[in-house]
Amino acid sequence: MKEMTPRERLLAAIRFQGPDRVPVSPRLWRYMLAHGGTQKAHAYLKYAAEFDFDPLLSFGAGPVILFPRPQSDYSKLGPGIRVEETTREEGDCRIVTRTLHTPAGTLTDRTRIPRPGGQFGIAPNNHIEEYLLKGPEDLPALRQLVQAWTAAHPVGDIRSFIDEMGSRALVAANTYSALSHNAGDVYPLEAMMIDCFERRAFVEELIDVFHAPLMAATKAVCEQGVEMVFCSAFFESMSAGWSPQLYRELFLPRIRAQVELSHRYGALYHLYDDGKLAATLPMHREIGVDLVSTLTPPPTGDITLGQARQVAGNRMCLNGGIDTVNTIWRGTPASIDAAVREAIGAAATPEGGYILGTSDSITEETPPENFRAFFEAGRRHGLLKGR
């Protein structure tokens, strides 16, 4: 068989069309930030050239977070919205307090922002001390804020980036779900879970404030001819505390809508959930998801690659399954080799259906010999059984 390009190899694996070998495409952003100070695509391509792997890139042609986060540029929000923002330093953090005035009402929030590279790690998450939304009475103001933000940041050109990457990478349009860093960052998840039983209509309306612009952005990128839509949907994860029933009732219909929209334009759909997947993976197959990441193994996750393959059959490609902490960071080249061999044996089929990937980003603490061992093992064991 003629050697495939990275883009061809990834597409063949996702479509079960017989790649020349198992694609290798780990998440690298933490390692890249620590060792090079950037996670930009061109830096990723340099790693790919050195270590011979297959870049699976996501590109945001518009805002993936559909409302202004603290310390944003508010200048384009328009005359109807005014933001007052104060900051103060406290230890290794910055405390940002905001008052956002809209024609429909006033919203307030307070966020603790840790310093990147400090005691909380290379790229720490913000800690929200006061959420923007207090209850249903704030929905009109939130809706105006989201509409103003997305209008000020329309979907731009993704086609040029895809063409620039060419055969060197498979590029997906990057989106975040209506909940992930969107509704889940303006209203606490714990309160939302309780509200599902006490005032479901409020939760549905809150999610749809973000789902509508998400769908509009998805349509806009699909009209540019993207080959794949990538959606991070980890706030919905079983690991966040949701039940399978609530997932089916609340989130699955909205994910299905984005899947079906992508498919109408001929684009593949890639769903990202780095938590527990045993209960939701059958639902993803049910609605036609083409590729699922990251299949985090036990004990953090709750499904093995062998179990995931049984669920996915030959209709859904799997990406991930290698533990970045216990296997890659804290392991040895020999144990990494064994884990990669086992993963490919469990998840790959003669037609493809598996991308050798990681449970999340390879960590900044990973020894160089372990980093290199992962890619060498992928090449060593990547010839598909039966081919």
State where each predicted segment sits.
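Surface-exposed flexible segments
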Residues: 38-45, 108-119, 369
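Intrinsically disordered, low-complexity segments enriched in proline/serine/threonine
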Residues: 8, 25-28, 57, 65, ...
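A generic structural motif
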Residues: 57-62, 126-130, 386-387
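Short, flexible beta-strand-to-coil junctions
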Residues: 28-29, 60-62, 99-104
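Segments that shape or occlude catalytic/ligand-binding pockets
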Residues: 37-79
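Active-site loop segments of alpha/beta catalytic cores
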Residues: 1-39, 101, 133-387
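A contiguous, low-structure linker/loop signature
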Residues: 73-145, 168
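Generic hydrophobic, aliphatic-rich segments that mediate packing or membrane embedding
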Residues: 44, 92-96, 154-157
